[in-house]
Amino acid sequence: MSSKTDTLELSVTATTATDALYWLEHIALRDRWSARLRFTLTLCADEALNNIVSHAFTPGHPAAIHLTLRQTRREVSLHIADNGAAYDPTQALSPPLARSLDDAQPGGHGLRLMRHFMHALSYQRRDGWNHLTLTSHSAPES
């Protein structure tokens, strides 16, 4: 495989994350990704998209999310762009791990998950848009 690109543009609704994950799952099946790549990229995309949908937009703001998936022999990158409030997740600190489930507090653990499973996370703010890229070096199976 030389290079392959897929794109999806969404208005933000109650089903935005679900619609995006369906699109990603379709590509994973079409291109015969490994089970690990499919699981990790879908899990991390779900986390990022749900955070964007839940926290990035104010009521009445025309909200949009654009996804671009680029695949090469060596890596798969999911670029997520949104026109919501500026937020750089690569600069956020993950909360300390709790000693037990009873002590666990919600918040920030999805970022830990993305840092664990992705080989690279990058962020830029350009022209009023957040640009987050999740990259995995796990190549699709052929």
Curated annotation (Swiss-Prot):
CDD domains: HATPase_RsbW-like. Its EC number is 2.7.11.1. Pfam families: HATPase_c_2. Keywords: ATP-binding, Kinase, Nucleotide-binding, Serine/threonine-protein kinase, Transferase. Changing D82A: Reduced kinase activity toward BtrV, lack of stable interaction with BtrV, does not affect multimerization of BtrW. The keyword Transport does not apply. Gene3D superfamilies: Histidine kinase-like ATPase, C-terminal domain (3.30.565.10). Transmembrane segments: none annotated. It is an enzyme of class 2 (transferase). GO terms for molecular function: ATP binding; protein serine kinase activity; protein serine/threonine kinase activity. SUPFAM superfamilies: ATPase domain of HSP90 chaperone/DNA topoisomerase II/histidine kinase (SSF55874). The keyword Lyase does not apply. InterPro entries: HATPase_C_sf. It catalyses: L-seryl-[protein] + ATP = O-phospho-L-seryl-[protein] + ADP + H(+); L-threonyl-[protein] + ATP = O-phospho-L-threonyl-[protein] + ADP + H(+). Belongs to the anti-sigma-factor family. Possible negative regulator of sigma-B activity. Phosphorylates and inactivates its specific antagonist protein, BtrV. Upon phosphorylation of BtrV, BtrW is released and binds to an unknown partner(s) that might be sigma-B, thereby blocking its ability to form a complex with its partner (possibly an RNA polymerase holoenzyme (E-sigma-B)). Involved in type III secretion system (T3SS). Phosphorylates BtrV. Probably able to multimerize; interacts with BtrV. Type III secreted proteins Bsp22 and BopD accumulate intracellularly instead of being secreted in cells expressing the mutagenized BtrV. This is Serine/threonine-protein kinase BtrW. It comes from Bordetella bronchiseptica (strain ATCC BAA-588 / NCTC 13252 / RB50).
